[in-house]
Design a protein with these regions (language model features):
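Aromatic-anchored glycine-rich loop motif in surface-exposed flexible loops
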Residues: 1-77, 93-98, 108
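An aromatic- and glycine-enriched ligand-binding surface/loop that stacks and positions planar moieties
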Residues: 80, 86-206
Length: 206
């Protein structure tokens, strides 16, 4: 409709691309870089220097940080999500002064929570830290610490319960599958849920 809206959409797309390339360059180093849509078979990809990719991502994120709105529907990239990624890429390329400046701006808009704020505050043996790491905290609009969320609402329907998103699946490979990693005494070494013996029914809210 206008330049601001166009730039906001473009900035959000730049964020998504920069996020992927930030992870790719840190995991693999030099990788192929695509700056346009591929609409037909292509076999002649070649790698770009990781630092040139990160510098391009930094440029794109400066644009995104300027144009993407502060307030967005949950699950979408907002100004401060762009700012956090910009800060990380600035540190990756050695622009520490810019990283500090952006970091201060983001922190200034997201003060730490200092008081109880979810329905869990009535549970015994809980505190603010429990609130912050609860499911409820991630959908509570009064939570000033939240910057960008992965939206997934657990359901009570047995057939639908596995449609929710597990945070670990977004951050790491599925290393708990099938109990492949064992302890020296043969017990499961990694799991996505606590052992029944370790659960506290008074405070666990999964």
């Amino acid at each position: 409709k206008d330049e601001a809206e166009r730039n906001a959409v473009l900035g959000a797309a730049y964020f998504q691309r920069a996020y992927r390339y930030y992870k790719l360059t840190h995991q693999f180093g030099d990788v192929p870089y695509l700056d346009k849509e591929i609409t037909e078979p292509k076999l002649d990809f070649y790698s770009y220097d990781r630092w040139s990719i990160l510098e391009q991502c930094k440029k794109d994120l400066e644009f995104a940080y300027q144009w993407v709105p502060e307030v967005q529907p949950r699950g979408r990239a907002n100004k401060d999500a762009c700012g956090v990624l910009l800060m990380k890429i600035c540190m990756a390329v050695g622009d520490f002064d810019r990283a500090i400046a952006v970091g201060k701006e983001v922190v200034g808009r997201h003060p730490l929570m200092t008081g109880r704020f979810t329905g869990n505050q009535t549970k015994p043996n809980t505190n603010l830290m429990h609130d912050l790491h609860s499911v409820e905290a991630k959908i509570d609009m009064s939570n000033t610490e939240g910057i960008m969320y992965v939206v997934a609402h657990p359901t009570t329907t047995p057939l639908d319960k596995d449609n929710r998103i597990y945070t670990m699946r977004n951050a790491l490979p599925y290393w708990a599958k099938g109990g492949a990693i064992k302890t020296p005494d043969g017990k499961t070494g990694t799991a996505i849920a606590p052992d029944e013996a370790d659960k506290n029914t008074e405070i666990d809210n999964d």
